[in-house]
Structure formats: C-alpha cells, structure tokens
C-alpha cells in the first residue's frame, strides 16, 4: 500500500517542535556485515543523499540540519514545518559512515531484511540478512532484480512469466498485462 513504517527507527519521528524532530534507532540494529548502526552513520548517509551530485537532494530542501544527538538518536531541524518528513526520509539509504563510494558500489552494505549476494550489470541477487532484527524479516530465500531497460523486453518477460513484478509499465501495455492476469496499479509520485 506504499505506506511508510519504521524499519531502522524504533518508531516514527518524535515532534519536539514544529521544526525539530528526533528519531531513535531500533535497539540492536546492525548492518548486513554485522557491525552496529550508529546515529553518525545515519547523519553521514543523509549527507551522501543530499550531496550536490545526488538526484535525491531536491527532496530535502526543507531540512536545515541533521545531527547525531548520541549514538542512537538523530535530531532533524527543519527550515519550516513539513508534514511528510518520514515519507521523504525513506530516500536516505543508511550505510556505514566508514565506507567509500567505490566500496559501496562493489558490495553495498545496508540495514534491511536482505543483503546483496551478487551484483552484475544486468542482475542483482539478494538473500536474507542474518543480522536483521526488525519487524519485517525476509520471507523469500532469494530475490532477483533484472535490469530490463527496453519496454518490449520488460513486457515480454512479464507476459512470459519470468518476472513477478514490473515497474514503469508503459500506458499502452496496461490492457495487455491485465489480459495476461497481471494486477496493474498506478501510484502518485512526489509531484502528484
């Protein structure tokens, strides 16, 4: 349903004032390499996300600062009140502050229920993260993402049954997919 629920956080952001929030990390949160997740990692990840080269920077213009209050608490100060704080912060992919960009591209480390097992130019494979202690553990033994950039290749894979989920469905293909038994959903983006 595309609703946002806490994953790495212990709960929703706590409103301190109209322009200040605090987020507490989940007890015992670890990265997929087994190291502890700290508030400094979240701050560093926010800084990566809002770097001038990042496509996600545009989604955080309402933020004044993000700081580590202590090892488990992040303080977010806003330039003005903003109702969709938690929905925007899902764009911050939390990674170890100590990792450089090349290491993250070669073997990404995260905090979710899955960890990367294999990455190629056309496919990504993920398996359950044994260090994950959140509310939504991995349910499938393996997840695979294929990079099918061509609309006709994605459509053929969907109708042929070699994929279970498809993003960016061409409007002209919706009826064909529905006719093949697919459930086609349309969800608004940030600008809608």
Label each PLM-derived region with a short phrase.
Residues 1-16, 25, 47, 109:
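N-terminal lobe/hinge region of extracytoplasmic solute-binding protein
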Residues 3, 89-138, 142:
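Gly/Pro-rich hinge or "lid" segments in bacterial periplasmic/extracellular proteins
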Residues 17-19, 26-28, 42, 47, ...:
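Solvent-exposed coil/turn segments that connect beta secondary-structure elements
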Residues 20-24, 58-98:
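Surface-exposed binding/hinge segments that line
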Residues 27-30, 47-54, 94, 150, ...:
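Sec-exported extracytoplasmic/periplasmic mature domains
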Residues 59, 167-192:
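Local pocket/hinge segments that shape ligand/substrate recognition
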Residues 102, 131-176:
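Ligand-site clamp/hinge motif
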């Amino acid at each position: 349903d595309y609703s946002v629920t806490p994953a790495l956080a212990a709960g929703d952001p706590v409103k301190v004032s109209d322009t200040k929030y605090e987020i507490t990390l989940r007890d015992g949160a670890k990265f997929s390499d087994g190291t502890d997740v700290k508030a400094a990692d979240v701050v560093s990840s926010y800084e990566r996300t809002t770097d001038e080269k990042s496509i996600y920077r545009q989604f955080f213009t309402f933020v004044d600062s993000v700081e580590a209050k202590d090892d488990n608490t992040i303080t977010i100060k806003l330039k003005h009140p903003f109702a969709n704080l938690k929905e925007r912060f899902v764009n911050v992919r939390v990674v170890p502050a100590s990792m450089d960009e090349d290491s993250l591209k070669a073997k990404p480390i995260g905090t979710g229920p899955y960890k990367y097992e294999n990455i190629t130019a056309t496919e990504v494979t993920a398996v359950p993260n044994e260090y994950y202690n959140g509310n939504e553990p991995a349910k499938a033994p393996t997840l695979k993402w294929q990079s099918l950039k061509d609309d006709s290749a994605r459509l053929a894979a969907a109708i042929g049954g070699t994929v279970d989920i498809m993003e960016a469905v061409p409007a002209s293909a919706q009826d064909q997919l529905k006719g093949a038994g697919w459930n086609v959903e349309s969800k608004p983006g940030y600008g809608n």
